[in-house]
Amino acid sequence: MNIHEYQAKAVLREFGVSVSKGVPILKASDAEAAAKQLGGPVWVVKSQIHAGGRGKGKFKEASAGDKGGVRLAKSIDEVKQFVDQMLGKTLVTVQTGPAGKQVNRLYLEEGADIDKEFYLSALVDRETSRIAFVVSTEGGMDIEKVAHDTPEKIVTFSVDPATGIMPHHGRKVAQALKLKGDQAKQAEKLVNQLYTAFIAKDMSMLEINPLILSKQGELRCLDAKISFDSNAIYRHPDVMELRDETEEDAKEIEASKYDLAYIALDGTIGCMVNGAGLAMATLDIIKLYGESPANFLDVGGGASEEKVTAAFKIITADPNVKGILVNIFGGIMKCDVIAAGVVAAVKAVGLKVPLVVRLEGTNVEEGKKIIRESGLNVLPADDLDDAAQKIVKAVKGK
């Protein structure tokens, strides 16, 4: 689960992390009061969306002006102007795709006298099963580009969970950032605070980009991005309250209610599969035959008829779907249950696009019989290759 920058900074404040003062703005009429509260003389108006690249992004609407999603204001009037221009407009960044995201919230923050910018993040390293830190002197930039162009400028290390964070980890960060004296001590303290927050809140990623050194010699988090482990959210009702469903795909929200693993994609063929590995293979073979999947959807091993029906309804709710491929290998998941769910869903929502069903495994004959006797216009497939070719041909009208 992702949260907004201003929410991430509020979480970090709980652990004593130094962050800039700011005020969230939900409506334009709040702009002047927020600016006066911070005092100025310089303010930063930041778009709050769940995507990176906001500063270099562009708004779709001409009325939003030609500046990006992060703007520097030097007067209260300019703050009000930017808020009016940005709030409610659609921001397109490298991470939003061409559709962009509507900016429903802004964050007004005090300006900062920046001497240096750094990069610092913590994440779950799946190779070592540990929390790893990524550090670089190249702050304020796309870290993927830094890793590609100048990998020697990135330092990484992991923390042994048996010992937890140790003083030498903080010293390693200070050394990587070329900090000495009091600034090095600040870095050591910050690393300890970030690790503590990461563990306490069950985060999966914590990114500070940039971490700045002010001209007054203070280390401060100028931006913050936090992702939480969705499997651990139940332990943190306070974190759940931070969820902004307007930033999430409506279909993904609906899928989460039924414990379905659903990810919206930008293709035309809807997929319903059991098992993540088989689902990935299904997406690949659709691409192989010249089309693109509209979603990743794993119904899991113990899906009920109700769950299958919900999955089918979610797929058909996508207006981009021109065809549907159901690919089930029944083990724990029984083919007759899938078949009954598909039939029930089709009868409930109607079938306006081609549907190919491939069933194999437990109760496969019963499943095929249910579909065959349903009277529905369903194309049966013998194997995955056959299924992919049939749905691609059907979508292309061949």
From Swiss-Prot:
InterPro entries, alphabetized: ATP-grasp (IPR011761), ATP-grasp_succ-CoA_synth-type (IPR013650), ATP_grasp_subdomain_1 (IPR013815), Succ-CoA_synthase_bsu_CS (IPR017866), SUCC_ACL_C (IPR005811), Succ_CoA_ligase-like_bsu (IPR005809), Succinyl-CoA_synth-like (IPR016102)
Cofactor: Mg(2+)
Pfam families: ATP-grasp_2 (PF08442), Ligase_CoA (PF00549)
Gene3D superfamilies to which the protein is assigned, alphabetical: ATP-grasp fold, A domain, ATP-grasp fold, B domain, Succinyl-CoA synthetase domains
Entry binding sites for Mg(2+): N209, D223
EC number of this enzyme: 6.2.1.5
Keyword flag ATP-binding: yes
Listed pathway(s): Carbohydrate metabolism; tricarboxylic acid cycle; succinate from succinyl-CoA (ligase route): step 1/1
Keywords: ATP-binding, Ligase, Magnesium, Metal-binding, Nucleotide-binding, Tricarboxylic acid cycle
Native organism: Afipia carboxidovorans (strain ATCC 49405 / DSM 1227 / KCTC 32145 / OM5) (Oligotropha carboxidovorans)
Binding site for ATP: K46, G53, R54, G55, E109, A112, E117
Enzyme class: ligase
Subunit structure: Heterotetramer of two alpha and two beta subunits.
Family membership noted in the UniProt record: Belongs to the succinate/malate CoA ligase beta subunit family.
Residue span, ATP-grasp domain: 9-254
Chain's role: Succinyl-CoA synthetase functions in the citric acid cycle (TCA), coupling the hydrolysis of succinyl-CoA to the synthesis of either ATP or GTP and thus represents the only step of substrate-level phosphorylation in the TCA. The beta subunit provides nucleotide specificity of the enzyme and binds the substrate succinate, while the binding sites for coenzyme A and phosphate are found in the alpha subunit.
GO terms under biological process: succinyl-CoA metabolic process; tricarboxylic acid cycle
Domain of life, per lineage: Bacteria
HAMAP family, sorted: Succ_CoA_beta (MF_00558)
CC cofactor note: Binds 1 Mg(2+) ion per subunit.
Binding site for substrate: N274, G331, I332, M333
GO MF terms held by the record: ATP binding; magnesium ion binding; succinate-CoA ligase (ADP-forming) activity; succinate-CoA ligase (GDP-forming) activity
Gene Ontology CC annotation, any one: succinate-CoA ligase complex
Protein known as: Succinate--CoA ligase [ADP-forming] subunit beta
Known catalytic reactions: succinate + ATP + CoA = succinyl-CoA + ADP + phosphate; GTP + succinate + CoA = succinyl-CoA + GDP + phosphate
